[in-house]
Amino acid sequence: MRNSKTNELVLTGLFTAIIIIMAFTPLGYIPLVVINATIIHIPVILGSLFCGPKKGAFLGFVFGFTSCLKATIVGGTLSSFVFSPVLAASLVGTSGIFKSLFIAFVPRILVGVIPYFVYIGIKKVLASEKKNLWGTVLNVLMSVFLAFGVYVFLGKMSESLSQAAALGIGIAVGAVVFIVVEAVFIRKSTQVIPFVYAGVAGAMTNTLLVMGSIFVLYKDAYADAIGVAGNAVLGVITGVISFNGVIEAIVAAIIVYLVGLVLNTIKPIAAK
């Protein structure tokens, strides 16, 4: 028990240091003009899994604090004010302080909580008598999500590629992944699905809650900042979710799975 607690504290300190380093170097954010695509949620997700939801929430708080600090000091994107109470207060008044604090912290704290329960829940499902059926169902959902991500990515990145071609490639990639995971991983190990879904859940928690909160709390100010009409904001936010969000989720799924397998041999994940 003592060794387990010590390992959790060491990992929490390590993940905290990684989050801080990633936040203030190019490693953590990918600037995409309208908003920063981030991979800082990955150590938060891993912390949630291997240190538990309480320490995961702390790591999420650190993530939120760094995004708030970076947005205030550095800026960098048109929408930096949504994470900075200082910039928001100067733009929309006192209410902006609370709105920006909510957006900067609440989604990120939940990134440190939700993946843990997703992982534990899926592990229990896959330990049931119908584990092969549930494994296949989850694999189908994962493959469809990946196919959609490839389709959106190709559609955004290549103007010369038709939508039909992008969709075909996406479906092909999704089908290949389904076959490989079904044939190689699921039948031999139940580790791949829980880790992958935990990664996706953490990434999408961040994207959906941040972008959803921006729409609810800052619709008009956000429209002015990025230079679009108010009625076009929903389309912009949907585009960010379907592009940034899907790409971030796929990257998170891969890294959480690969790193998670290694860490799980050192410190197995236990139910809290």
Protein language model features and the residues they cover:
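Loop-helix junctions at membrane interfaces
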Residues: 1-272
